Amino acid sequence: MSLLKKKDEKKTEQERVEERREEVLAKGRKFKYPLQWTKHRIVINTILISIIILAIIVVGGWLALYRLGMTDELLYRITKIVPASVATVDNEAVRFSDYLMLYRSSMTSIERQSGSQFDQSSVESLRAEYKRIALTEAEKYTFAASLAKQLDIEVTKEEVAAEFDRHLKIGGIDRSEEGFLKIISDNFGMDKSEYERMLYLSLLKSKVSIAIDENANKIAGQVEKLLSENNNNYGAVAEQLGDAVSYEETGGLVDSKNIDGGRASEAMKLEPGASSGKFVSMNGDGYYFVKLIKKTDSEANFVSIKVPFSEFDKRFNELVESQKINESIKIVDPNNQ
């Protein structure tokens, strides 16, 4: 009897321990679950706040770019990261960053001089004018890129590097890269990657223009043939071809650094009376032929014939007329409202 009583007492003691354990665990759960709920709520609130901030940034950026037409440095940097489009050309997106790059490079020197040379009204008109020019140019580059895909045309990194090196030596001056980058930064507000981007776009458009302009290639062939038959008489050849070409004489010595599409620097390579073969103008708008009349160490007197490219602009204008170019911004000159 006493043995059964001890077993009962022992069992009762174990039960008391279990009960105590459950009480402790139950009290712990009261603290555990509210803490988990609080952490969960903090995570949700953080996500919601992040979404709200992101939405404010997106809406603010959209208003700044598409409604207010802002072009400041921060927005430009954002468009280089975020693939925003400023227009479409035959359903191909025009990069906002390209438009801003072209516009900002054109306006940099003017805005730096505006305090002394231009009144505010003139500056605003210039901004509207250069925005229009930059947007049209960006649209043309996009159209060129679209045609390049169709024609399997590309511009390699090596070609861009070679063109960059050529620009270092424009005018016969062997500039250092550091010095040249300072020049483009001071005058255009561009760094090397931006300048290389501009060179890439220009080279691509030039290659496409050459590939599609059968008429210009045909006329250039006629110029070569006629020059050979007429002892390099540029005036006579230009007269025969009429409006298909343009003829120009310097009328005297001009600086070899003259900004003329590369004609002066090309003439400096020749001997008097010699004629160059055809070469593409530095801005890619046509072929040039040059004949040297006279030169010194730093100047040249020459005549030239230009065969302009026209097919690219013709096709682009057809897109404009058929309303296949849709712009996401409105460019308005405040002085003409």
Task: Report each predicted region and the residues it spans.
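Peptidyl-prolyl cis-trans isomerase
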Residues: 225-266, 294-301
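Solvent-exposed, acidic/flexible segments
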Residues: 80, 92-96, 123-132, 136-141, ...
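Short, low-structural-confidence N-terminal segments
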Residues: 1-125, 262, 266, 284, ...
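N-terminal targeting/tethering segments
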Residues: 73-190, 194
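Extracellularly exposed regions in secreted/surface proteins, prominently low-complexity, repeat-rich
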Residues: 298-299, 305-337
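Proteostasis/folding factors centered on peptidyl-prolyl cis-trans isomerases
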Residues: 181-210, 262-306
